[in-house]
Each structure stands twice: as structure tokens, then as C-alpha cells.
């Protein structure tokens, strides 16, 4: 079971959700990765908290450009993940 979300994580997840609902539909599907960068960000914040989750999200977004091939890039397992990957 993952720890409860910090207020900072909740705020960042809410901002990502606003992007997903209001901005992303206007831009159309263009993410090179699976899961999308915004879904990755939400999952990273849930698994790792605001500091490490934000760092992982920023690194992911910086890789999202035409020179990177993209593909499957899941969030790494968190400290509370019990599933085998």
C-alpha cells in the first residue's frame, strides 16, 4: 500500500489533470511514450512523492522531443510496490 499523498503531490497531480482535460485535447495526441508523459507524472508522484516524482517527471518530459525514439517507458517500481515487474 502506498503512503498517503502529500499536499504538494496533490497540487501537482491536480495541475496535470487540468492539463489532461483542458490543454491536451486541443493539442491532439503527440506523446512519443507509453504511458503518456502526463500519466507518467501522476504515477511518479503517487509512487515517489513530490520531490523524486517531480524529478522523474521533468526528466521524462525533457526526453519527449523528435530526436528521441520514444516507446515504452514505465515509471520505475516504488518502495511500496509489491508486484514483480
Curated annotation (Swiss-Prot):
It comes from the Bacteria. GO terms for cellular component: plasma membrane. One of its GO terms (biological process) is protein insertion into membrane. Keywords: Cell inner membrane, Cell membrane, Membrane. GO terms for molecular function: membrane insertase activity. Its main location: membrane. It is found in: Cell inner membrane. Transmembrane segments: none annotated. Pfam families: YidD. It is a peripheral membrane protein. Disruption phenotype: Cells lacking this gene are viable with no apparent phenotype, but they are affected in the insertion and processing of three YidC-dependent inner membrane proteins. Belongs to the UPF0161 family. HAMAP family: UPF0161_YidD (MF_00386). Could be involved in insertion of integral membrane proteins into the membrane. This is Putative membrane protein insertion efficiency factor.
Amino acid at each position: 500500500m502506498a503512503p498517503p499523498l502529500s499536499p504538494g503531490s496533490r497540487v501537482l497531480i491536480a495541475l496535470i489533470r487540468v492539463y489532461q482535460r483542458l490543454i491536451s485535447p486541443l493539442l491532439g495526441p503527440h506523446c512519443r511514450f507509453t504511458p503518456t508523459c502526463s500519466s507518467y507524472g501522476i504515477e511518479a508522484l503517487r509512487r515517489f512523492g513530490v520531490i523524486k516524482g517531480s524529478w522523474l517527471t521533468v526528466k521524462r518530459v525533457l526526453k519527449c522531443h523528435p530526436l528521441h525514439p520514444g516507446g515504452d517507458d514505465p515509471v520505475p517500481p516504488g518502495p511500496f510496490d509489491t508486484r514483480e515487474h
